[in-house]
Structures are given as structure tokens and as C-alpha cells.
A protein has these predicted regions:
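Recognition helix of helix-turn-helix/homeodomain-like DNA-binding domains
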Residues: 26-40
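DNA major-groove recognition helix of helix-turn-helix/homeodomain DNA-binding modules
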Residues: 45-60
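Residues within the alpha-helical elements of helix-turn-helix
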Residues: 12, 23, 53
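Short, charged recognition helix plus adjacent turn
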Residues: 8, 33, 62-67
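Residues in the helix-turn-helix
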Residues: 19, 30, 60
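A short, Lys/Arg-rich alpha-helix, primarily the initiator
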Residues: 1-16
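Short alpha-helical "recognition helix" segments of helix-turn-helix
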Residues: 20-21, 50
Length: 67
């Protein structure tokens, strides 16, 4: 199972969903799904914009656990 750790990364950096929306140009509603880990299909464009804005690697946002 793949889970997003966006909430943890954002909390650690002190970035809100609203601020991330401003930094990335991605709609708040879309980021909210990533933040709450309810997104079904990951968009590479969205992940790239998030990584760029938060100055992090994709591995910082995704966690793989065996289910």
C-alpha cells in the first residue's frame, strides 16, 4: 500500500494547505485530498509542484508498506 506523508512534511515545515496552494498554483481542494490521503490516482504534475514548493524529494511524500 502506498500512503502520502504530505501532512507530516507540511506540519514539519509549518506550511498550511492554503499557503501550499499559493506556492504551487494547485487548487486547495486538490491539495486537500493529497493532505488527507484520500486521493485515488497520483498526478505526477501535482507531486512535482509539491516537491518543488516544499523543497523535498518524492520519497519524502510517499511511503510504501506491505499489506
Amino acid at each position: 500500500m502506498i500512503t502520502l506523508t504530505l501532512k507530516e512534511v507540511m506540519d514539519k515545515q509549518g506550511v498550511t494547505r492554503y499557503r501550499l496552494s499559493q506556492l504551487t498554483g494547485i487548487q486547495y481542494a486538490i491539495l486537500d485530498k493529497y493532505y488527507k490521503n484520500t486521493v485515488i490516482r497520483y498526478d505526477s504534475y501535482v507531486l512535482d509542484r509539491i516537491c518543488t514548493a516544499l523543497n523535498c524529494d518524492i520519497a519524502d511524500l510517499l511511503k510504501h508498506t506491505k499489506s
